[in-house]
Amino acid sequence: MQFWRKQMSEIQHFSQQDIEILGEQTLYEGFFTLKRIQFKHKLFAGGQSGVVTRELLIKGAASAVIAYDPKEDSVILVEQVRIGAAYHPESHRSPWLLELIAGMVEKGEKPEDVALRESEEEAGIQVKNLTHCLSVWDSPGGIVERIHLFAGEVDSAQAKGIHGLAEENEDIKVHVVKREQAYQWMCEGKIDNGIAVIGLQWLQLNYAQLQQSWKRS
């Protein structure tokens, strides 16, 4: 582990101090905010870049949950329509996607609290032994969104039906799927949204450890 850390420190030389924001302009404010940013940064070969202009979609943060039943070796997936998957002109696949439970982190909220709340709102389940897995950037070339991924122990017998908030026009169907089946669907490309792919890969690598850890709790 010390060797790995040493290697990372040798590779990554730049920090926040090596990029300078020159200006920003709000282009649109709605469900999300769109800004135009101008910046410059240090170059690998030395010196400074020219002025770079980029549009950024400001989304903030989100939490996602690998809702896993260790006794049944099953994972809870939710299905809902996604306009981004419907809008792609070359896609002939259904825009109703199989996903992990997830939701946006509002100002003042903690990611772990959002994970627990969304589990109840989207799937009607209670989560215990919530464990932080990792946090990742979602397409940081043009989007500001940090996704916090958690794993949580659930009783899959609770998970059924259709859920979501009426005031947000949510229509979410709950599915209980064996872990190996969900992983196979991911490998076949049937589950193809980023955070679900990351989450199911993480679960495949760590499910045995979760089973042992939760058994002791």
Swiss-Prot record:
<feature type="binding site">
    <location>
        <position position="170"/>
    </location>
    <ligand>
        <name>Mg(2+) 3</name>
    </ligand>
</feature>
<dbReference type="GO" id="GO:0019144">
    <property type="term" value="F:ADP-sugar diphosphatase activity"/>
</dbReference>
<feature type="binding site" description="in other chain">
    <location>
        <position position="104"/>
    </location>
    <ligand>
        <name>substrate</name>
    </ligand>
</feature>
<dbReference type="Pfam" id="PF00293">
    <property type="entry name" value="NUDIX"/>
</dbReference>
<dbReference type="InterPro" id="IPR004385">
    <property type="entry name" value="NDP_pyrophosphatase"/>
</dbReference>
<feature type="active site" description="Proton acceptor">
    <location>
        <position position="168"/>
    </location>
</feature>
<keyword id="KW-0378">Hydrolase</keyword>
<comment type="function">
    <text>Acts on ADP-mannose and ADP-glucose as well as ADP-ribose. Prevents glycogen biosynthesis. The reaction catalyzed by this enzyme is a limiting step of the gluconeogenic process.</text>
</comment>
<keyword id="KW-0479">Metal-binding</keyword>
<feature type="binding site">
    <location>
        <begin position="54"/>
        <end position="55"/>
    </location>
    <ligand>
        <name>substrate</name>
    </ligand>
</feature>
<keyword id="KW-0460">Magnesium</keyword>
<dbReference type="GO" id="GO:0046872">
    <property type="term" value="F:metal ion binding"/>
</dbReference>
<protein>
    <recommendedName>
        <fullName>ADP-ribose pyrophosphatase</fullName>
        <ecNumber>3.6.1.13</ecNumber>
    </recommendedName>
</protein>
<dbReference type="GO" id="GO:0006753">
    <property type="term" value="P:nucleoside phosphate metabolic process"/>
</dbReference>
<feature type="binding site" description="in other chain">
    <location>
        <position position="82"/>
    </location>
    <ligand>
        <name>substrate</name>
    </ligand>
</feature>
<feature type="binding site" description="in other chain">
    <location>
        <begin position="31"/>
        <end position="32"/>
    </location>
    <ligand>
        <name>substrate</name>
    </ligand>
</feature>
<feature type="binding site">
    <location>
        <position position="118"/>
    </location>
    <ligand>
        <name>Mg(2+) 3</name>
    </ligand>
</feature>
<feature type="binding site">
    <location>
        <position position="122"/>
    </location>
    <ligand>
        <name>Mg(2+) 1</name>
    </ligand>
</feature>
<feature type="binding site">
    <location>
        <position position="102"/>
    </location>
    <ligand>
        <name>Mg(2+) 1</name>
    </ligand>
</feature>
<feature type="short sequence motif" description="Nudix box">
    <location>
        <begin position="103"/>
        <end position="124"/>
    </location>
</feature>
<dbReference type="InterPro" id="IPR000086">
    <property type="entry name" value="NUDIX_hydrolase_dom"/>
</dbReference>
<dbReference type="GO" id="GO:0005829">
    <property type="term" value="C:cytosol"/>
</dbReference>
<comment type="similarity">
    <text>Belongs to the Nudix hydrolase family. NudF subfamily.</text>
</comment>
<feature type="domain" description="Nudix hydrolase">
    <location>
        <begin position="58"/>
        <end position="204"/>
    </location>
</feature>
<feature type="binding site">
    <location>
        <position position="122"/>
    </location>
    <ligand>
        <name>Mg(2+) 3</name>
    </ligand>
</feature>
<dbReference type="GO" id="GO:0019693">
    <property type="term" value="P:ribose phosphate metabolic process"/>
</dbReference>
<feature type="binding site" description="in other chain">
    <location>
        <position position="145"/>
    </location>
    <ligand>
        <name>substrate</name>
    </ligand>
</feature>
<feature type="binding site">
    <location>
        <begin position="139"/>
        <end position="141"/>
    </location>
    <ligand>
        <name>substrate</name>
    </ligand>
</feature>
<dbReference type="InterPro" id="IPR020084">
    <property type="entry name" value="NUDIX_hydrolase_CS"/>
</dbReference>
<feature type="binding site">
    <location>
        <position position="118"/>
    </location>
    <ligand>
        <name>Mg(2+) 2</name>
    </ligand>
</feature>
<dbReference type="InterPro" id="IPR015797">
    <property type="entry name" value="NUDIX_hydrolase-like_dom_sf"/>
</dbReference>
<dbReference type="GO" id="GO:0047631">
    <property type="term" value="F:ADP-ribose diphosphatase activity"/>
</dbReference>
